[in-house]
């Protein structure tokens, strides 16, 4: 019999979604919404990020909160749709990064948290 707990999950279903918010209150509101709807298992909010980018031909610099959201492939589109519909930015940062490896216990918790 195989010991599932000791096995590596070779291709985790987990993904990390990156999103910036203009301030901590907005980031906390967005995080609370996606957590309540079980679209993300965890939201890490990192205040103090500085973003530089061109918008409509002008160099912009904004102080933002970087949101790191942990979810699964099967929840990623609903998470992106939710963030986009409740985000104050016209074009929010919404990037999905694949998770190629992770601790089995953490990945199991992540999956269970979204059920």
Curated annotation (Swiss-Prot):
Protein name: Divalent-cation tolerance protein CutA
HAMAP family: CutA
Compartment(s) where it occurs, according to its Swiss-Prot or TrEMBL record: Cytoplasm
Main location: cytoplasm
Positions annotated to bind Cu cation: 19, 86-87
Gene Ontology annotations for the cellular component aspect, listed alphabetically: cytoplasm
Function: Involved in resistance toward heavy metals.
Organism for this UniProt entry: Salmonella typhimurium (strain LT2 / SGSC1412 / ATCC 700720)
Highest taxon of the lineage: Bacteria
Cofactor binding description: Binds 1 copper ion per subunit.
InterPro entries: CutA_Enterobact (IPR023700), Ion_tolerance_CutA (IPR004323), N-reg_PII-like_a/b (IPR011322), N-reg_PII/ATP_PRibTrfase_C (IPR015867)
One Pfam family in the UniProt entry: CutA1
SUPFAM superfamilies per the UniProt record, alphabetical: GlnB-like (SSF54913)
BP term (GO), one: response to metal ion
Keywords: Copper, Cytoplasm, Metal-binding
Gene3D superfamilies referenced in this protein's UniProt entry, alphabetically: 3.30.70.120
Binding partners and assembly: Homotrimer.
Required cofactor(s): Cu cation
